[in-house]
């Protein structure tokens, strides 16, 4: 009996020792903490997974956005190239159209100029025709009156203030031009007023033209005897100068109209146009 009691006591001691080794049983608060930690771990894992999913989605969308951006850049580049090509083509077409317009404008201007010249020429022909008809009528009247009185200029001569003028279309030296006028019962033109000067300029144009003024025999004289010193003069500045530097020998002894209408002395051998003049009552 005592042995059994000792064995039982020993067994109880072993159980107590085993319990001491294992520690005290877990309390409810500890279990709650363990459960709470598991939940936190699970929540953290879930959040990590969710975050990973979000990152994957964002990465996928970012990749798609990059592809879209590259596509947009390519489309923009293609559009830019296409636009530049179209602009160049339009510029080329515009330049071509501009050249064609300038060509058309040039042609129109030339045609207008030709028409103006033709119109002016036609008017001159009409005026000349009227003058010729008038001269012919005048000559017929003079013929019927046995030529006792002249009331108009010969054909191709121009009447002005009681004188008749003939304008050459060829050129001759001063002496030959003067002889030609004498054969027409006239003389080289003698300019006696500003009005006559203007009349002559309108008919001559801007051409060098001999007039009946010379100093070959001394002082300047008009061929018809008109007084030079007290009469009308229209020399260019510093003229006459009797210049010897022309290399043609001698000085300058004959006067002529210059291109602006003023007078200049020159070598008489130069070939210029000329104007003949005669009084209306002396015209043939």
Swiss-Prot record:
Lineage: superkingdom: Eukaryota
Transmembrane segments: 40-60
GO cellular-component term (any): membrane
Membrane topology of the entry: Single-pass type II membrane protein
Molecular function via GO: asialoglycoprotein receptor activity; carbohydrate binding; identical protein binding; metal ion binding
Keywords, alphabetical: Calcium, Coiled coil, Disulfide bond, Endocytosis, Glycoprotein, Lectin, Lipoprotein, Membrane, Metal-binding, Palmitate, Phosphoprotein, Receptor, Signal-anchor, Transmembrane, Transmembrane helix
Tissue: Expressed exclusively in hepatic parenchymal cells.
Originating species: Mus musculus (Mouse)
Keyword set includes Transmembrane helix: yes
Positions that bind Ca(2+) 2: 215, 252-253
Ranges of the Extracellular topological domain: 61-284
Disulfide topology: 153-164, 181-276, 254-268
UniProt short sequence motif Endocytosis signal, positions renumbered to this chain: 5-8
InterPro entries linked to this entry: C-type_lectin-like, C-type_lectin-like/link_sf, C-type_lectin/snaclec_domain, C-type_lectin_CS, CD209-like_CTLD, CTDL_fold
Keyword tRNA processing assigned: no
Coiled coil segments of this chain: 59-117
Stretches in topological domain Cytoplasmic: 1-39
Function: Mediates the endocytosis of plasma glycoproteins to which the terminal sialic acid residue on their complex carbohydrate moieties has been removed. The receptor recognizes terminal galactose and N-acetylgalactosamine units. After ligand binding to the receptor, the resulting complex is internalized and transported to a sorting organelle, where receptor and ligand are disassociated. The receptor then returns to the cell membrane surface.
Compartments it resides in: Membrane
Glycosylation sites: 75, 78, 146
Additional comment: Calcium is required for ligand binding.
PANTHER family, sorted: MANNOSE, PHOSPHOLIPASE, LECTIN RECEPTOR RELATED
UniProt modification remark: Phosphorylated on a cytoplasmic Ser residue.
Protein name in the entry: Asialoglycoprotein receptor 1
Subunit structure: Interacts with LASS2.
Biased composition (Basic and acidic residues): 1-18
List of residues binding Ca(2+) 3: 239, 241, 252, 264-265
């Amino acid at each position: 009996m005592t042995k059994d009691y000792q064995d039982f006591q020993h067994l109880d001691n072993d159980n107590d020792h085993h319990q001491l080794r294992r520690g005290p049983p877990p309390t409810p608060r500890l279990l709650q903490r363990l459960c709470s930690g598991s939940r936190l771990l699970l929540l953290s894992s879930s959040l990590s997974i969710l975050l990973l999913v979000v990152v994957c989605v964002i990465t996928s969308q970012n990749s798609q956005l990059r592809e879209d951006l590259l596509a947009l850049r390519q489309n923009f580049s293609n559009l830019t190239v296409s636009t530049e090509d179209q602009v160049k083509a339009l510029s080329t077409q515009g330049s071509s159209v501009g050249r064609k317009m300038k060509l058309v404008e040039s042609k129109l201007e030339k045609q207008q100029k030709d028409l103006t010249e033709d119109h002016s020429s036609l008017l001159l022909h009409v005026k000349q025709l009227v003058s010729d008809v008038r001269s012919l009528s005048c000559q017929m009247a003079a013929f019927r009156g046995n030529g006792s009185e002249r009331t108009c200029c010969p054909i191709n001569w121009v009447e002005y203030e009681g004188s008749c003028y003939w304008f050459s279309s060829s050129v001759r030296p001063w002496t030959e031009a003067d002889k030609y006028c004498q054969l027409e019962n006239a003389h080289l033109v003698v300019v006696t007023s500003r009005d006559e000067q203007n009349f002559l300029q309108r008919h001559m144009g801007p051409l060098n033209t001999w007039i009946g003024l010379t100093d070959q025999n001394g002082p300047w004289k008009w061929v018809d005897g008109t007084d030079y010193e007290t009469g009308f003069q229209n020399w260019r500045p510093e003229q006459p100068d009797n210049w010897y530097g022309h290399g043609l020998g001698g000085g300058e002894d004959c006067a002529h109209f210059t291109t602006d209408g003023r007078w200049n002395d020159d070598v008489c051998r130069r070939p210029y146009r000329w104007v003949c003049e005669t009084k209306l009552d002396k015209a043939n």
